[in-house]
């Protein structure tokens, strides 16, 4: 664990750079995987399926059958819970819907902006170790609200080559039938470029580990992506009024996700700074073995506690980190809202642990990481739509404005543009 007493911006940025460098070590491998899947299709994909998946998957059983989906067995309570959460998520995401608009100018021209859903989207659902059905919900619900026609789901198989029944049942409830058992960079490449078996999509959304995050970064431009949603992050700003057990529990809630996850506590309390490491250790020991192992590595490498002399400085550091998740555990959690500039999602007060955001409080949990919250946002309905401009110029407006447009074209040096306008003026 890293302890920092009143660090400057350079020290904080150095810490963040170290984490990014640890991730970028696999970048060349990712590029090679993408290149080969793009050029060789199924042949390369099958090789990577056998090399990287926990259970070797052949091309012939890459896609999950409808029979497998319908036969997925889960508790009835799970089904009822998922249905409740879907409605809660829809209630929030419907408020994000953007409307087309059209209007007529004084001269009779018809102008507007048409909001159109994307035709196809690929959802990457992390898997293998645990069934991230919550991520499936967070990605699929806004896509459904937006009206996306084709939604493909890809998730790594477990050690038996199967997909978690919780994932399959969630797909069935959502009405999703196109499901692939593949993960990693090769899954991203297959959805981007297509293969003989996998049909390409227009956009890929969903978080993943290092390989997935870097793969999405490299295919962007050939396909749309949501954001750089990689290994999890949390920053907790506290003035010392919060219970140490709450802080420690929330710290580890992200550390258990991934060995490259980053948990940071920024506090104005010397007591928190000095005592929290021991409390975190106690909570760490209480975790199941596999989660404890992951959380310990993450905590040792990237777990950080920072002491500052004021809440103002605490939020300056938080804005510098631009965390995926930001918890505000202070006496009056609404008061500092004006200081928050960079964060994927903000959780206010002692009852709003980040975990409730993971499982359906309303806002999406697919969020920007690696400081990309400085310029991007969490997944939302508009990520699944595009805007198409509509123009119909009336004869009156053309007569009145065409000479101006013709002159502008010539000032820019585009004679053919000007002539396209002039030839119409000559025929009036």
From Swiss-Prot:
Belongs to the histidinol dehydrogenase family. Substrate binds at residues 232, 254, 257, 325, 358, 412, 417. Catalyzes the sequential NAD-dependent oxidations of L-histidinol to L-histidinaldehyde and then to L-histidine. Keywords: Amino-acid biosynthesis, Histidine biosynthesis, Metal-binding, NAD, Oxidoreductase, Zinc. GO terms for cellular component: cytoplasm; cytosol. It is an enzyme of class 1 (oxidoreductase). The gene is hisD. Zn(2+) binds at residues 254, 257, 358, 417. It comes from the Bacteria. The active site is at residues 324-325. Its cofactor is Zn(2+). It comes from Thermotoga maritima (strain ATCC 43589 / DSM 3109 / JCM 10099 / NBRC 100826 / MSB8). The keyword Signal does not apply. This is Histidinol dehydrogenase. One of its GO terms (biological process) is L-histidine biosynthetic process. Pathway: Amino-acid biosynthesis; L-histidine biosynthesis; L-histidine from 5-phospho-alpha-D-ribose 1-diphosphate: step 9/9. NCBIfam families: hisD. Pfam families: Histidinol_dh. InterPro entries: Ald_DH/histidinol_DH, Histidinol_DH_CS, Histidinol_DH_monofunct, Hstdl_DH.
């Amino acid at each position: 664990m890293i302890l920092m007493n009143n660090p400057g911006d350079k020290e904080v940025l150095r810490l963040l750079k170290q984490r990014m460098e640890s991730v970028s070590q696999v970048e060349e491998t990712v590029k090679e995987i993408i290149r080969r899947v793009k050029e060789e299709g199924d042949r390369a994909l099958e090789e990577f399926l056998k090399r990287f998946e926990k259970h070797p998957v052949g091309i012939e059983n890459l896609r999950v059958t409808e029979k497998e989906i319908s036969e997925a067995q889960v508790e009835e309570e799970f089904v009822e819970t998922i249905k409740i959460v879907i409605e809660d998520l829809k209630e929030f995401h419907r408020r994000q819907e953007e409307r087309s608009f059209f209007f007529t100018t004084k001269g009779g021209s018809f102008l507007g902006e048409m909001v159109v859903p994307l035709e196809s989207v690929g959802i990457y659902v992390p898997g293998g170790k645990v069934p991230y059905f919550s991520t499936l919900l967070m990605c699929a619900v806004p896509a459904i609200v937006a009206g996306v026609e084709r939604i493909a789901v890809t998730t790594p198989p477990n050690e038996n080559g199967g997909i978690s029944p919780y994932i399959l049942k969630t797909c069935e409830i959502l009405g999703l039938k196109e499901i692939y058992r593949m993960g990693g960079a090769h899954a991203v490449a297959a959805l981007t470029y297509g293969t003989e078996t996998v049909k390409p999509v227009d956009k890929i959304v969903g978080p993943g580990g290092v390989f997935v995050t870097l793969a999405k970064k490299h295919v962007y431009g050939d396909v749309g992506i949501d954001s750089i949603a990689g290994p999890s992050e949390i920053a907790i700003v506290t003035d010392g009024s919060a219970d140490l057990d709450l802080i420690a529990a929330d710290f580890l809630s992200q550390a258990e996700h991934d060995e490259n996850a980053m948990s940071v506590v920024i506090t104005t309390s010397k007591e928190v700074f000095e005592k929290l490491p021991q409390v975190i250790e106690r909570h760490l020991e209480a975790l199941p073995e596999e989660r404890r192992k992951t959380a310990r590595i993450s905590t040792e490498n990237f777990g950080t506690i920072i002491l500052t002399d004021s809440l103002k400085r605490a939020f300056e550091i938080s804005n510098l980190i631009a965390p995926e998740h930001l918890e505000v555990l202070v006496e009056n959690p609404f008061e500092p809202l004006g200081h928050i500039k960079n964060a994927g999602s903000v959780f206010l007060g002692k009852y709003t642990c980040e975990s409730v955001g993971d499982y359906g409080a309303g806002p999406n949990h697919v969020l920007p990481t690696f400081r990309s919250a400085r310029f991007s946002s969490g997944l939302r309905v508009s990520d699944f739509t595009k805007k198409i401009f509509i123009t119909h110029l009336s004869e009156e407006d053309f007569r009145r404005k065409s000479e101006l447009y013709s002159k502008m074209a010539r000032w820019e040096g585009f004679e053919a543009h000007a002539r396209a306008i002039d030839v119409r003026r000559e025929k009036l």
